[in-house]
């Protein structure tokens, strides 16, 4: 158990930071952050919790306990075989990232349909999968000092290899960005865990996941060796066991671009509305396009 967990002051400061973060997001109106209760995390005798659903790869409230099998070539949970793709190296990333991109299928000459940068591996990926996003905020000053030392070593070894000189230039560029704009150095990792109980279907899922990552401009990396460790680190509360070698250094601004903000549509709570359909899967929805948008501050006028 980390010593910080036993420190009441450290726990209190952590909870205060979480509460402040929650208020900031909830004040934006468009994004709502809700803290899970203990029962929602670990479950009750009548209803499965988040951890139990994760271990069984199921969204059902009544889940089935499944055996977890690990081997050198694959990982199985019950009958399901895991297929893991990772973004853990800067060489696998595009030259630039952004918070949102234009989705051509639903855009016109006069209007844009904007989706998050990572939308292709979110709801747009039509298979059973989990998209995990990790941001590790360590001591930024210590990280930058470590890079300064590495840059000096690379400079000393530059006469032996041109690669060392190029690495020093990349490190200097990273340090210049950090010091010029006051950016916070962090570690980031993203992975897509897909699964199927059919090996033939799993091959299709593997290709679809690789294509989705390619749409983001990323190089798909199929990971079999670290799948068990990454699955364990994805347990709610298990991020402390994340394998550090699977992360890459970046800044907060670039790291959050790999978040996916889309979610499935939900019925409006209003007693009246119109029937529409989810564009992704055709699910019928009850939608209030009149009063509810005004209550939420999305629009200030309406025509009835």
Where are these regions (language model features)?
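Glycine-rich phosphate-binding loop of nucleotide-binding enzymes
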Residues: 269-304
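Extended, folded cores of ATP/NTP-driven motor/assembly subunits in large transport
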Residues: 1-263
